[in-house]
Amino acid sequence: KIDSLQPWSGRESWMKYSPDSLYILYCKNHNLYVMGNKDKGQDSTEVQLTFDAEKNFTFAKEMDDSDGEVETVAEWFKDSKKIYAVREDARKVKDLYLVNSLSQPRPTLKTYKYDMPGDKEISQSELLVIDVETKKITKFNIDRWQDQYFEVLYVSKDSERIYFERTNRAYNEKELCVINVLTGEVKVLIHEVDKPFMDFKMVSISFLNDGKDIVYRSERSGWGHYYLYDGEGNLKNEITSGDWVAGPICEIDTVGRALYFYALGKDENIDPYYYTLCRASLDKPNSVEQLTFDNVTHAVDWSKTFNYFIDTYQRVDLEPHVVLRNRHGKKIMDLEKA
């Protein structure tokens, strides 16, 4: 007998509810639509918001043709009054082909758009903000480089600021920017040049206190390290520094103002490819504290209070061990062994 299943809520995967749950946003025939949530007493008549979309210039999350309702790339602002969308124009991009050899009864061919090095025409991005009530569409000027890459990173709680990053095609120069949704003004907060090529796998930008603090990873010193900026783009502090690599962030304690991250190559007694857990104050330079010391690689999960963490450590010749440690790295007890 199965009695643990929850009743179906009626929410389809293509439904993108506003934060106040009064409206539903979706895509149909590549365009944006909105309707009221009848469960909240709203008019469920669908209203079309855009009219210029088409295949490969769509608001759908997937670019394939679809006559029915599908999930959209557009997102709600927190005020539930506006939406924003980053739409890609891939109409001039060349096709790439993939054969599904597992298809039955015969293999099938999938065709899709794909940017490749050397192409003269690649995908172009645009940023739109739409007022759901008035249906006014505002297109913002986000261009800096030809054929740039563009990504929205954070939206302020008051729905008035959009933080985004734009990167040139050569991937050796980028800018962190904020746009004022009310005025359209774009302000560059951080401008970064890293030749010949940026490490895109280690890119890390965290917004704290609704954008008043920004934790930004850079290789400007020749080593990957974290820096603290204020909301205006002014450097406040070098969180980490030295001839070693500050790797992925584990957690950020916004109350205790501490950054927990994995270091590589910091301890000469540990393989530089292994993750070593460290803590650093956001506000005090040269305050990095190493929390794990064994010659193994670590993966940790912190408690909500940051008083304890579960540490899973292993090595190519050592099976995974799971232990509980306090905030200083001292082992409290063994939990599991593979």
Model regions and ranges:
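Beta-strand C-termini and the immediately following turn/loop, strongest in propeller blades
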Residues: K1, Y23-N31, G36-N37, T72-E75, ...
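Short glycine-/Asp-/Thr-/Trp-enriched loop segments that recur within the blades
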Residues: K55-E69, W145-F150, D194-M202, G242-I249, ...
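Non-catalytic accessory segments flanking enzyme active sites
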Residues: Y84-E88, V93-L96, K120-E126, F140, ...
